[in-house]
């Protein structure tokens, strides 16, 4: 009995310890599992199905928006297939082809197109498309400004290789209108095609390659006045292209102003007169008051020639009624000074007619023509030009483009009043169309658009003679006849519109 109690007493603590140990292990296991589950759930991110990829929609701004962005003086100056003179705020002034009889128009258009194509060939039009550089080219090369005279040779600047190292470098250069060479003294196996249209460079040395490239020459082999060659430079799959302009430089034509640079050695005054001898005499008297020895050239297509007793007046007669622009051409052709001042025969010089001011403007700027004002009237107008296939649109707007730097009050424009100083040579290059016999002015500036840079300085003023009829019956009769010739009739307007349709390849104007 005693022994059984002792055994039971001994076994109970052991069982208790075992139970406690098992409970402890279970608790630890539960805690570890709980932490693990917590970690798993905290890092778990549900996977949602990805939406299908949709390509972005590429679109341009609507035309209404573009018109707001690129409009100048109500004119949408943006590339388009056909310019329009009757859209938006524009109102058509002339549709030039309407000046022709409809049955004559097909034949006129055929001749017009043939002449236009001839003009384009002579001007090198249309221009070649722009050269586009592919990305990541291993070359250095010129992008603009390489120019050579016909049959001359130049070094091509800026050629170099900037790509990765290679066991062998092979670069090929090609030209179309000239030949290529190099000044580098290297073996023939490193440079092949000297003096040919294709030059091949092959070398193991990067330094040698760049030395050869730095001394590559271009030789023009055919005579052109103005042509553009495209030279290509190839390495493996990379190709660079750049322009070489072949252009014959002009010989300067200079006028000696003399050691003292007197105004009479710089400027000649020119005018055209017709049936107004009394007006011309008043003009000459006013000129002599301020410029006693300046040369004045007069072209006259009146019936009766005048007697002018002035050592500094050159007087040229023409067939009766030969015309306004023909007389301008005659007068300009006889000028021997750097500048010519154009005035009408009924103008009047005053102390504000400072030719020296206009000379100073032309001497210090790139202007070809600078106008003054006639009693405050500058007649400034801007010409905006749009080219399209079937004819161009011409928009005339009053005013100027911008101020002329360095000359307060002066501006840049397209056309000015009949009182202007011009470079004699530039005036001759544009010329005055002699077919315009009676009423013409703006037509000269249209012909000169793109050739003449025109300015206006209103501070230089010439006066207009009074328009009261003369008391002398003979002079009054002359003025009456003059007015008939100067009338801007509907037939005269129609003639000029037809002329501009064909000659200037115009479609419409506003």
From Swiss-Prot:
This is Beta-1,4 N-acetylgalactosaminyltransferase 2. Glycans are attached at residue 390. The chain crosses the membrane at residues 16-32. Keywords: Disulfide bond, Glycoprotein, Glycosyltransferase, Golgi apparatus, Membrane, Signal-anchor, Transferase, Transmembrane, Transmembrane helix. It is found in: Golgi apparatus, trans-Golgi network membrane. One of its GO terms (biological process) is skeletal muscle tissue regeneration. Residues 33-510 are lumenal. Its EC number is 2.4.1.-. Homodimer; disulfide-linked. Pathway: Protein modification; protein glycosylation; Glycolipid biosynthesis. The keyword Cytoplasm does not apply. Beta-1,4 N-acetylgalactosaminyltransferase involved in the biosynthesis of T-lymphocyte CT glycan antigen carried by CD45 family of protein phosphatases. Catalyzes the transfer of N-acetylgalactosamine (GalNAc) group in a beta-1,4-linkage from UDP-GalNAc to the galactose residue of NeuAcalpha2->3Gal-R to form GalNAcbeta1->4(NeuAcalpha2->3)Gal-R glycan epitope. It holds the Pfam family Glycos_transf_2. It comes from Mus musculus.
